């Protein structure tokens, strides 16, 4: 009974001090009708009062979404101190990748890394609600979490839901916690970019977002770490195979998702999803030679696409058409044509038995 009373009384993942934050209607909270720069919502999944309110279970789910993918529309409230730029929510700044299993339990185990940063044990779990002192100030820089629960529950936004007659009708939002994304390898579910060493700066890595116009196989080198840092969940699954927890013939389904923000990141303008299937061994030491072969073929496709685009542009120009989008349209059609054949070829590779 006491637990039930606590659930009713306490506010899930909310911060009372956020009541001074930027006010938003329920549409801001609901990711299914998350507002873009387009003011008219066409073919919306909600209409009438349903757009202006949420049930408590709905609000709890979308609270997690807003914390991780919020744009930068919320304004700074503190007047007496200089605050850093907020930036989008943490997941909105990542090129998210995760491994899809045969069922929910399998998926969770494939992505629940017991080691961080390529080998070290996580520190003792400390979710945000178990900190010695709750963080309530806006836009607070903190160290990169050293425990998995801390990473998964970090409050990138301070949010307080508005309730009326058993419904959630809106929220107020402040900027929350953030950490330096440079070499933040505690984050296991992202692609990485590499910044080469310069005269005054050592080499470092930072999260790589997905290109909205690129199929996932075109980012193959980022999955393997050939030219960058291998995503943590990919490394984890290859480790499970090396330890014989997963079979040598294990097939891997990699899912990717991401979002794109508009000017100044004030609104979300597009979203990205893709999936890719291949033998897990292709991403392991056993598949090193094949990794180079696949990357060569990706590069060959890129060069062919450039040639197709150039040819289309020259033919269009010869016909008197000076449309600047001709080349890009031809490249897009080229990739659409080869997309499925390339995926099927990648899926069919068995690095243990197939010859290069």
Map each language-model feature to its residues.
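Short Cys/His-rich metal-coordination motifs, predominantly Zn2+-binding knuckles/fingers
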Residues: 55-58, 174
